[in-house]
Amino acid sequence: SKTPIHLYRHNVFVDLVRSQTGIWGIFAGVLLMASLYNLLLYFGIKDRVYLVYIGYIISAIALMGTVLGFGFYLWPLEWQLFIHEKIIVVNYTIAFFTLAFCTMFLRYHKDRCWRYKLSVGLLWLMLVLGTLSFFIPENIAAPIFFVILGLLYIVCFILIYNKLKSGFRWAKFYVFSWVPLIIGAAIQPLELTGVITYSFSIRHAFLMAILCEIVLMAMALADRVRYQRERALYHATHTQQTKLLNSAKLKYAFMALKAQQRSTTLCLVKIRHFNSLNTI
């Protein structure tokens, strides 16, 4: 690490602390509000993906609170020191929830295909290695984690690409959420190794990237709910075998015409031995 040491005048330092506190407060406030909101959604919808999303948010707060230091304002000193000592475990936690959210959001737990089994296998591997990291020195656990991180990106891209190829257009916000995460994750090590010159914005680039990612993930969840409602309405108004409007939709349309007192003629035709449009 090539973290620089800067000497500030008193007024400049006060402005720096004020700016840092402000951006930390925005980050923690937005994420905590998102957690509470999604907890309410879980109680209403009973979809476990919201619990996974909350787990990811809490892990992100713990990670950034330890890396940047604002965790001292959020929880007791003993907790902050313990999290700092077990920072690799926190990294495994956020990686675990990242893959779990990707799997459940894209509904692979419904498909049970080989991609789902690949995801579950990596989740179990991260769970085991994360547990072992409580007892392994950081200088040994860190290189292992970076290997797992590479596998995580590969598996997530496989899951996302397959769904995009099959027409999961409502997942566009989730795909976009990976862009700031990848950019922010690349900037932080470049800054720590001296490749990129240190600045206030560079120092907090990963924090802002996570904030943008979580906002886009929330938008993706909202888009997912909208899609599920549209599908539920479609199934309620269409016959699954023929893909044609069913009697419920016909009754609704006919009653609407009657309410408008419009002259209407209803003609019913029965086709024998008809199962689908392909049999005509």
Question: Could you say what each language-model-derived stretch is?
Answer:
Residues 59-104, 109-233:
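Interfacial "cap-and-anchor" motif at the non-cytosolic start of specific transmembrane alpha-helices
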Residues 232-252, 269-279:
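Conserved nucleotide-binding and Mg2+-coordinating catalytic segments in signaling enzymes
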Residues 265:
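Cell-envelope/extracellular polymer assembly enzymes that use nucleotide-activated donors
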Residues 29, 52-55, 144, 176:
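Hydrophobic core positions of alpha-helical segments in small-molecule transporters
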Residues 1-43:
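Extracytoplasmic
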Residues 36-59:
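Juxtamembrane interface at the cytosolic side of transmembrane helices
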